Every structure is written in C-alpha cells, then in structure tokens.
Amino acid sequence: MLHKGDKYRDVDGTEFQVFGALDDTYTYFFIANLKQNIVIRMQPKNATEFLSGMEKVN
C-alpha cells in the first residue's frame, strides 16, 4: 500500500514522491517526479504497478 510521503528511486536516479493517497480525500494517487518537477495523477492500481519496480528511499 502506498502512503503519503513515500519516496521511490528509479534505476536512472529519478525520485518520485507520493503526496496524495487513498487515505486522504483523493480517489487518485498524485505522484511527483522530483527531477522534472511534474505531477502525475494515477489510479491506485496503475500507481502501484508504476512504483513496484523502484527502490523505496524512505
């Protein structure tokens, strides 16, 4: 389960942070790409699959 504040690192060093999660009022996960300063909105299943291959930083 993803939680607000979780950070993940991709193989190329790009870090992503979850800043909106299901335990908030959101129906989507909001994931920030910290390298490019963009926000990605994903459905829960897609967000979990997207981050599953990455290393958890915190």
Labelled PLM ranges:
Residues 8-10:
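Tryptophan-anchored aromatic micro-motifs
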Residues 13-44:
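Basic/aromatic-rich interaction segments and small domains that mediate binding to polyanionic partners
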Residues 36-58:
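Intrinsically disordered, low-complexity, charged/polar segments
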